Amino acid sequence: MLATDSDPIVAIATAAGRGGIGVVRVSFGRGGEAAAQALSDALCGQRLAPRHASYVPFVDAHGAPLDRGIALYFPAPHSYTGEHVLELQGHGGPIVMQLLLQRCLDAGRGFGLRLAEPGEFTRRAFLNDKLDLAQAEAVADLIEASTEAAARSAGRSLDSAFSRQIHALVEDVITLRMLVEATLDFPEEEIDFLEAADARGKLAKIREQLAHVLGDARQGALLREGLSVVLAGQPNVGKSSLLNALAGAELAIVTPIAGTTRDKVAQTIQVEGIPLHIIDTAGLRETEDEVERIGIARTWSEIERADVVLHLLDSRTGMTPEDETIAARFPDGVPVVRVLNKTDLTGVPACVEHPAAAGDLTEVHLSAKRGDGIDMLRAELLRIAGWQAGAEGVYLARERHLIALRAAQEHLAQAADHAEQRAQSLDLFAEELRLAQEQLNAITGEFTSDDLLGVIFSRFCIGK
């Protein structure tokens, strides 16, 4: 839990380091108009007109100038936090920013001004109904976006695209709950509220809409989190060459000497806006070399955590007994793509195959050295991830959102079962609808615990 939500708070709102402009932001809590005017008098030597940019000197306690810049005063509720807010925009050097910050703290000591906690400005925006919880999370996601697609999707979430979908679902669930409750409250009435309003049809439509939202949310989560891809196999099958080919840069040392890579080498690349976290690992084999053994142990740890494993083979030898032993140790539930590398030495054309004997496993024949088949491998990784090329209107989502959507989906499925039994299960029908609504409301922040809010906002940067 953050300190006190009514305290005046201050922080540097721009990134650390040097820049053309730096911003110090102050939010004054409840009823902070007098404090805002007092601080602007102390720092700027004048009271500021609301929502007007004033070019003023920023002065210390003795009236000596610290900097000159733009001061902006936003009276409540028309500000980012919904409180009275003062922003000082000066030159973006770290020393001058620290001087302005300390000057604010000294001048505001009398009314309890303190340093803001991470995410506290956005937390107040949420508490003052300027943003819902999904939008607040989108602020952090927009700042942290690692690809253009992720940034655009976070922008759509911030613009309420995700929240509007959730609110529409909640309204439909509430409407259906009203029909069920009316039937429960007036059992003696001759009117069958559920039949008259086609309750089953309404429920089916809600479930269909929820499935669509969940599909979009999965795409958004993929944009945010990306895919962890581990390159595994015996030494000298071309794992480092494949990493370099996927990344388009010489990141790993490539030699004909087996065991060159002794620890993991990681690189994040973008494919259609999806971050792929590619991890090159030590070759898997029996060895007496202690350093190499440590690297191999780390390889298996990475494989356990992977979203996808690329099992590299030498296309000249195919699947050897040693490769069979390695494949047998791959964890259940982690997709494996068998990559037969070095087709430049065999003359086999690059291709993707689905051998009948391999079940669901896919084989990609390629040459990391020449680049043949690399695009096929990228496409296969996107297919495994479930990415739909050209998907429009995707909004960024988090694992928390997916969990809530899946839980709501399960409650609605249970509600559908109870709807079929009618009289015997009407109470349970109503309860499952209530639980589904509760899960959906948790996404936008209605009925959300303080503990969860504390975790979410603590992950923001200070000053946001």
Swiss-Prot record:
GO annotation, biological process: tRNA methylation; tRNA wobble uridine modification
Record-annotated disulphide pairs: none
Protein name (Swiss-Prot/TrEMBL): tRNA modification GTPase MnmE
Binding site for GTP: 236-241, 255-261, 280-283
Gene name of this polypeptide: mnmE
EC class (word): hydrolase
Listed Pfam families: MMR_HSR1 (PF01926), MnmE_helical (PF12631), TrmE_N (PF10396)
Compartments, as annotated in UniProt: Cytoplasm
Keywords (A to Z) from UniProt: Cytoplasm, GTP-binding, Hydrolase, Magnesium, Metal-binding, Nucleotide-binding, Potassium, tRNA processing
Organism, as annotated: Burkholderia vietnamiensis (strain G4 / LMG 22486)
UniProt-recorded Gene Ontology molecular function terms: GTP binding; GTPase activity; metal ion binding
UniProt: Mg(2+) binding residues: 240, 261
Binding residues for (6S)-5-formyl-5,6,7,8-tetrahydrofolate: 25, 87, 130, 464
Task performed by this protein: Exhibits a very high intrinsic GTPase hydrolysis rate. Involved in the addition of a carboxymethylaminomethyl (cmnm) group at the wobble position (U34) of certain tRNAs, forming tRNA-cmnm(5)s(2)U34.
EC code(s) of this entry: 3.6.-.-
Gene3D superfamilies: P-loop containing nucleotide triphosphate hydrolases, Probable tRNA modification gtpase trme, domain 1, tRNA modification GTPase MnmE domain 2
PROSITE patterns: G_TRME (PS51709)
Gene Ontology CC: cytosol
Bound cofactor: record note: Binds 1 potassium ion per subunit.
Residues binding K(+), per UniProt: 236, 255, 257, 260
Family of this protein: Belongs to the TRAFAC class TrmE-Era-EngA-EngB-Septin-like GTPase superfamily. TrmE GTPase family.
Range of residues in the leader sequence: none
Subunit composition and interactions: Homodimer. Heterotetramer of two MnmE and two MnmG subunits.
Cytoplasm among keywords: yes
Domain TrmE-type G: from-to ranges: 226-386
Cofactor(s) in the UniProt record: K(+)
